[in-house]
Amino acid sequence: MIAKRLLTELDLRDFKALSLYEASIEESILLILSSDHQIEDIKNFHSAINNSVAAALQDKLIIFGVTPTYPATGYGYIKSEKQLDHNNYSASKVDLFIEKPDEKTAKLFIEDKKYSWNSGIFVFKANTILNEIKRFSPEILENCENCLSKSVKDLDFLRLNKTLFLNCENIPIDISVFEKTKKAFVIPLNCGWNDI
């Protein structure tokens, strides 16, 4: 996979920048990730990403789940319909998102095996996520479209209008879309992931 264009957020807006891509790339597959994640096993990371594309092409919104290694209270958790198969990267429907549980609850999640850490890494088709944003958070899409209309192309970058961008609400896409949609699926990610 090779990025054709790059879009960076001017300030933290929890992935709202992705909806600015509506113009001209609605059929594109998008990989959304944070700059503060550590990935130790690049080969497994690439395998997980490449395997997620087939699911994204079926209009599934993919989020990656990391097998918990300890009862973390600083991460969100994802409950999947079935236990994730870490050998074949198969997608399982998301049952529930849980934000930063207490230690006792986190221990129960580890024992259950249907729970994984929310990596905050996403793959989906642009038009699929745009339709879900329009359905569940239309005001976010409207603000982002206004920002896009005043952006400037610069080589491979799209430079956003800072004033309009800062008007976009700062709400995670997990909350604004993924917790509400029926199209959310989780794929296992075993690559030495760490949120630094």
List where the protein language model places each region:
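Short, intrinsically disordered, charge-balanced linker/junction segments flanking boundaries
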Residues: 6-12, 191-196
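Catalytic core of tubulin tyrosine ligase-like
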Residues: 77-196
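Conserved beta-loop-beta/alpha segment of the NTase-like Rossmann-fold superfamily
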Residues: 7-84, 135-136
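Short hydrophobic/aromatic-enriched beta-strand-loop microsegments
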Residues: 3-8, 141-144
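Residues at structural and domain junctions
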Residues: 4-7, 38, 64, 92, ...
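Short coil/turn connectors at secondary-structure junctions
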Residues: 2-3, 26-28, 57-61, 73, ...
